[in-house]
Amino acid sequence: MNYRHVTFAVAFICTSVATAASAEPRAVIELFTSQGCSSCPAADKLLGELSSDPSLVTMSLAVDYWDYLGWKDTLALHGHSDRQRAYAEGRGDREVYTPQVVVNGTVHVLGSDKAAIEKAIAQTRHKPGVLALPVTMTLRDGKVMVNVAATQNELRSGEVWLCPVTSKVSVEIGRGENHDRNLTYHNVVRRWVKLGDWNGKSETFSVPLAELPKGEYSLKDIDRLDVVVQSGVAAKPGPILGAASTSCCTASTN
């Protein structure tokens, strides 16, 4: 995935410090969805329900490969399509579809099947290294501070990614399979920002909020930040080793 960084000024209208929950998540749920997919609204709704569980990091990743059906997804990133295909190639099954959920970077299931998602969570918790890595995230003085602990686990290298997220977005669909519907999306990932590489040692990554990339969205819509430490590389992602999530300040550009 290719990412472009844009520098801009921000003005915060919140407290200066916010800390991620101390409890480590039991799962990272990535939903690959599309506004042009008539099977997706049920999965989008389910993700909203799962998002109320504080032990889960839930992420909505809109893809763009259904845009040719008549409606251009307003939340899609081409990088999400690339990420989904990379997962499929890594698993060796080449199964790319919507709605698809990938649990902890390892197992995929139908995104609207709650029982299958819960089963996948239970299965992946026993895989070596999955979410065994303590990760904390703090917002302080206009910076995001991410600390990744040291480990002696078998999987002790990976990439550290920061995702600006919008908790809730409603969209009027004008064409395509979902035309004339008003659909709500939860925990919409707006961008993937690589903070750096992690190599098994305790390390802190810092980035000014003012230097986060600005995608096709208004900065004031960003109200959450997720961080994911994932084995492998972007073109061949592996199990998710650690993750954290925190509420983010509402901000506006100057």
Short names for language-model regions:
Residues 9, 32-35, 243-244:
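Disulfide-bonded cysteine motifs in exported proteins
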Residues 15, 38-41, 249-250:
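Secreted/luminal cysteine- and crosslink-motif detector
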Residues 1-5:
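Positively charged n-region of N-terminal signal peptides that target proteins for export
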Residues 21-97:
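Active-site-proximal cofactor/substrate-binding loop regions of enzyme domains
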Residues 101:
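Ligand-binding face of N-terminal immunoglobulin V-set domains in extracellular IgSF glycoproteins
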Residues 7-16:
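Bacterial N-terminal signal peptides
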Residues 74-94, 107-254:
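Short, conserved sequence motifs used for protein processing/export or organelle targeting and
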